From Swiss-Prot:
This is Carbonic anhydrase 5B, mitochondrial. GO terms for molecular function: carbonate dehydratase activity; zinc ion binding. It comes from the Eukaryota. Keywords: Lyase, Metal-binding, Mitochondrion, Transit peptide, Zinc. It comes from Rattus norvegicus. InterPro entries: CA_dom (IPR001148), CA_dom_sf (IPR036398), Carbonic_anhydrase_a-class (IPR023561), Carbonic_anhydrase_a-class_CS (IPR018338). The gene is Ca5b. It catalyses: hydrogencarbonate + H(+) = CO2 + H2O. SMART domains: Carb_anhydrase. The keyword Cell division does not apply.
């Protein structure tokens, strides 16, 4: 995910760059395991996206994101509540290319667009949403499930306005942020997403911004309420371990042409040598000692056949 919402002008207004530190990083991206056949033979020895050049990859944390979610290892928690989502379309402000993704930002001075319930103790205000995607449809998501990649992943970023005065403060502290992750898979055309796609040509270059009013991002959510949750971090600098992740089990369908429009965006500003905005995801991080909890029972999800109780006529005397 990216928290680069107030990061346009200087470090003073940047919740992402406040803690950036310079040091050496490998120029090659490690191989990312993937169960899709197209991922088994591909190489990932590409130059890092501009955001990661000359920056620390891991700040010695043990709750880093993204992770590979192992379905059978996740723990069903009956105490997890349903997630309640209430977004006011009128709070949508604009869409912009921040040089790493495209963000749709929202007015967040009041509780007009919030989530509550689920694993959360407080209401969290919607700040922005953005996507991560690959150079082709075989990969692109930040999280994986049983090592399976999806073509793209949506992140809806919320902050805890009960405990913190600002998004910038919340982004650096434990339990400061709640991010809903939604996988995108190839399928039918997504009508609501098309409104976003139609706007992308106007923000092709880095640091371009246009107004984008009256949009309810809940239309990008799957209908299934099931989710996984775990404690993690931002996936862009400063990589703060401030995030309660809520990863939706069910992906949403988009078509190939819509994803291709994502790939027309550029990491670079107008006048610079063009560099396509693709593969803007962080490599997988180790789970360490964390537990991934699920809001659903595994026997239902994995279609395990449960033997029915014997009828009275079948019971031996």
């Amino acid at each position: 995910m990216t928290v680069m919402s107030h990061l346009r002008v200087s470090l003073q207004v940047s919740s992402c760059t406040l803690l950036w530190r310079r040091f050496r990083v490998p120029r090659l991206v490690p191989l990312r395991s993937c169960s899709l056949y197209t991922c088994t033979y591909r190489t990932r020895n590409r130059a890092l996206p501009p955001l990661w050049e000359n920056l620390d990859l891991v700040p010695a944390g043990d709750r880093q994101s993204p992770i590979n979610i192992r379905w059978r290892d996740s723990v069903y928690d009956p105490g997890l509540k349903p997630l309640t989502i209430s977004y006011d379309p009128a709070t949508c402000l604009h869409i912009w290319n921040n040089g790493y993704s495209f963000l749709v930002e929202f007015e967040d001075t009041t509780d007009k667009s919030v989530i509550e319930g689920g694993p959360l103790e407080h209401n969290y205000r919607l700040k922005q949403f953005h996507f991560h995607w690959g150079a082709i449809d075989a990969w692109g998501s930040e999280h994986t499930v049983d090592s399976k990649c999806y073509p793209a992943e949506l992140h809806l970023v919320h902050w805890n306005a009960v405990k913190f005065e600002s998004f910038e403060d919340a982004a650096l502290e434990e339990n400061g942020l709640a991010v809903i992750g939604v996988f995108l898979k190839l399928g039918k055309h997504h009508k609501e997403l098309q409104k976003l796609v139609d706007t992308l040509p106007s923000i092709k270059h880095k640091d371009t911004l246009v107004k984008f009013g009256s949009f309810d991002p809940s239309c990008l959510m799957p209908t299934c309420p099931d989710y996984w949750t775990y404690s993690g971090s931002l996936t862009t600098p400063p990589l703060s371990e401030s995030v309660t992740w809520i990863i939706k089990k069910q992906p949403v369908e988009v078509d190939h042409d819509q994803l291709e429009q994502f790939r027309t965006l550029l990491f670079t500003s107008e006048g610079e040598k063009e560099k396509r905005m693709v593969d803007n995801f962080r490599p997988l991080q180790p789970l360490m000692n964390r537990t991934v909890r699920s809001s659903f029972r595994h026997d239902y999800v994995l279609n395990i056949q449960v033997k029915p109780e014997p009828t009275a006529s079948e019971v031996s005397p």
